[in-house]
Amino acid sequence: MHGLCTHGFVCRGLIEALIPGEPEKARRMACRFSKTLYPGDPIKTLIWKTEDGSAVWRTINAKTDELIIDNGIFEYGDIPKDEVRFDDRVAIVTGAGAGLGRAYAVELAKRGAKVVVNDLGGSRDGSGDGAATPADEVVKEIKDMGGEAVANYDNVATPDGGENVVKTAIDAFGTVDILINNAGILRDKSMVKMEPENWNAVMNVHLNGSYHVTQPAFKVMREKGYGRIIMTTSAAGMYGNFGQTNYGAAKLALVGFMNTLKLEGQKSNIKVNTIAPIAASRLTEDVLPAEMLEKSKPEMVVPMTLYLCSERCPVSGNIYNAGMGGYSRTAMMTG
């Protein structure tokens, strides 16, 4: 988690130095970690501009001058005119009433997609009766800018809820091309205080909820021979985070879900990938430091996610970290 955050802070520094106020022009960043960096260690990034649109960089420990990150490459420039489009595509985004889900839904609609905005309207821990307002507000925002969208208020934690989300897409737009499993809740407790109710509530939304929506959507995609599915994992699942055994277990389980689903979808041109976002949202507002929240706008996760949802995406079964202007891939290896 700390290495991922360091990567994000460095990317932010590169953007401020080379393309201030224009983070959307960041095109590519690559590097190699040479030494372990511990929480609280100060860092300094050295940048050499090699040519227009390109720079090399390295990061050192500002206290000891030890090399932390080497072989850094940063490329930047204007966005290509042939932008990724989703004309005539139908997308479902769960948990889309605010934060990341809203950002996904709005940008998909801007680029031509017809969007089902699913949001139960409950609180961060999933409690409460829910309210239609969050989903309706996002739908209104999309329609006001000339896009097409419908709201859905079903709870993905139930099989019927998942079926109804997909049914909403079929009834409104006739099909499903894209599914972003984004809905989530938190019930943080240390293991000795983790009651079955809190364990199951988190599993039911994150893991079971993704299954409840993905299965009916996958059937439609397989029949038509096309689909893009996004799972959402977390550093808490890949590396652990105190007090989040339920959340971490659910989030890493989604990686296993992806690994098998990519095989089942291969013959039908269904790509399944996973995003590990760092973004300011109702789930992270009291988890991430205030300084990180200010630099972690949900919109900075959107480009990677939308690319994985597009026809251009050639990969399936990968995990991508996204946030704070930086993108990288996480891979599990043996040996």
Q: Residue spans of the language-model regions?
A:
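Residue(s) in the substrate-gating loop at a strand-loop-helix junction
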Residues: S234
